[in-house]
């Protein structure tokens, strides 16, 4: 069948990310012209009837790209069956379904991006665009110079090798609220990818705990101007810079 891959069509329509669209197909929730769709299938949205959960797939809505300062204790998922607070509830979605482009664990804070543009999110998260992450991390006990050198050189974690691109002493930006009772030392660190709890696992490997972890930058986008729980729309130039292409 000619046309586009089904998961790309679903992502472009704003129903899910590319990976989420693949899961919808695998779960049997997508039909094309009345029959169950298969992974890898192509379709033409101009001529084929595409249904997701029994609802006809409509035209793609206007793309939305938001930056939000996630507080600690909020999930970086669109929904939660246990009713826990989601970062999506912090923003005005204008009735559109949004999901996070990338994640932070529930105890971490800082910059996240919410969008309904699955194709853009897929590009933005791809390593080829070099959107490194920068964090302000409160570490206790403070790691030695030798420990930091080891983390910069790289160590083997259970899911493969990992390393810090850089680590330097320095406080978090002013947008990050601080406590008088905090213990440890603040570091500014850079990593090249966003693997699950990667920063925490790296410091655990040298005998230190991450007391607070605040993401302050993704690629060229920073936390500047966003206090905890605040959000804003990305400018078109910011959207383009993160994905190497113009948004739809």
Where are the model-predicted features located?
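Basic, flexible Lys/Arg- and Gly-enriched helix-loop patches that mediate nucleic-acid binding at interfaces
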Residues: 1-248
């Amino acid at each position: 069948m000619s046309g586009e891959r089904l998961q790309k069509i679903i992502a472009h329509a704003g129903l899910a990310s590319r990976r989420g669209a693949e899961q919808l197909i695998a779960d049997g929730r997508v039909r094309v012209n009345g029959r169950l769709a298969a992974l890898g299938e192509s379709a033409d949205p101009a001529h084929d009837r595409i249904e997701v959960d029994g609802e006809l797939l409509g035209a793609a809505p206007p793309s939305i790209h938001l930056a939000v300062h996630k507080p600690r204790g909020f999930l970086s998922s669109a929904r939660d069956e246990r009713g826990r607070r989601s970062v999506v509830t912090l923003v005005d979605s204008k009735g559109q379904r949004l999901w996070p482009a990338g994640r932070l664990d529930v105890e971490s804070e800082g910059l996240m991006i919410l969008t309904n543009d699955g194709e853009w999110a897929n590009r933005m998260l791809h390593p080829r665009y070099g959107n490194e992450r920068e964090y302000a991390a409160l570490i206790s006990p403070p790691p030695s110079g030798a420990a930091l050198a080891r983390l910069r050189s790289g160590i083997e974690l259970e899911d493969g090798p990992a390393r810090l691109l850089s680590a330097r002493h320095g406080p978090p930006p002013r947008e990050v609220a601080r406590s008088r009772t905090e213990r440890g030392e603040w570091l500014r660190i850079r990593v090249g990818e966003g693997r699950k709890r990667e920063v925490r696992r790296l410091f655990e490997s040298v005998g230190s705990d991450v007391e607070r972890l605040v993401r302050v930058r993704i690629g060229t986008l920073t936390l500047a101007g966003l206090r905890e729980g605040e959000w804003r729309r990305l400018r078109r130039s910011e959207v383009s810079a993160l994905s190497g292409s113009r948004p739809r």
